[in-house]
């Protein structure tokens, strides 16, 4: 059973699973080669940054790291995906792709369950 936890992204992510996986795979397949822990760090950093309105300072505090570390991790996401975190459309695509990964695709990359959204 899938919990939607009131999130439009969660609802969109699981509404048509096969279609969503096909749509977002090109966006995030560049992370598949990373270790589970390295991928989690990047995905968690992005999620916390988005949830805090793009504040590097707040994201750093919540992740127990310096804002420059958050900036570096976000830059790595931009480099890997070819998307810019200064463009709202790119941010939206990454949000959806990471939500689909968290809810539907994590099993194809590793065997650990996804970290629940905070």
Language model features by range: what are they?
Residues 1-118:
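Cytosolic nucleotide-utilizing catalytic cores of signal-transduction proteins
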